[in-house]
Amino acid sequence: MLVVNNISFGYSKNKIVLKKFSFTLKEGEHLCVMGESGCGKSTLLKAIYGLLNLNSGNIFWKENEVLGPKFHLVPGMNFFKYVAQDFDLMPYISVSENIKKFLSRFYPEESEKRTQELLEVIEMKAFENTKVKNLSGGQKQRVAIARALAKEPELLLLDEPFGQIDNFKKNSLRRNLFAYLKNKNITCIVATHDKNDALSFADKLIVIRNNKILVNNHPLEIYKDPKEKYVAALFDDVNEVTVGRQSVLRYPHQIKIVEKSEKNATVINSYFKGSYWLIEAE
């Protein structure tokens, strides 16, 4: 189990990024972290990985305390893997060589089998002999994920893992990756702006605002009852509708056009969304 206990961190006294964060995550569970840019998502992942010296609080994985650079010559926990947005790949060797980099050379057959398995997960078999410098940003992102999984981690930390990947590839890659992690019982934390990472694949969702945890619950519960417009807006367009004396939040699909109503609206635009039209009215 991962236990994050009342941690705070700032890059300076005047720039506190994480304010008293507390949550737990069971082994094998998947957590998504959402929030506006600059709210602390990436910083939280770095803190959990052990790249930062906390101002206060502590982090435990099972019986082991996660300690920062002050306590390690090489920061970062050995049984965690962290995939940042800059990938940190080796550009002049092939895709398969990047994946094999941290696998044992004493067991070449096992290393090759593991590499082929991960190439299937990231849908990159056709590029196994391609040098990384010749790949697109999205392809590099997929290789970085595979390399992180090569020596099977207990906890995988992913920072915007599908941000540079083509839309037509995202869905199948998500399904492959998260199914693989569940099958291997690998705990995963994903920092993301994309609601699809959370709604379809996460066991828990944390929303951050103003450097604090605003909500922490199952994604379905947060989506159905978002409490604040800021939270609802992470998933979809949202309307504040007055019902009686109360103001309630409603997604577009929860509003219907009827022949007779106490409320009138004038359509000012419409947007084709493939399976439906989004109507803008005032």
Q: Which ranges hold each PLM region?
A:
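Helix-to-loop junction immediately C-terminal to a conserved catalytic motif
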Residues: 49
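Conserved ABC transporter NBD signature motif
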Residues: 57-68
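ABC ATPase NBD coupling module
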Residues: 66-81, 105, 222
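Conserved ABC ATPase "signature" region
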Residues: 110-127, 179, 185
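Conserved ABC ATPase signature
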Residues: 131-135, 139-141
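A short, proline-enriched helix->beta-strand linker immediately N-terminal to the Walker B motif
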Residues: 150-154
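Conserved ABC ATPase "signature" C-loop
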Residues: 210-211
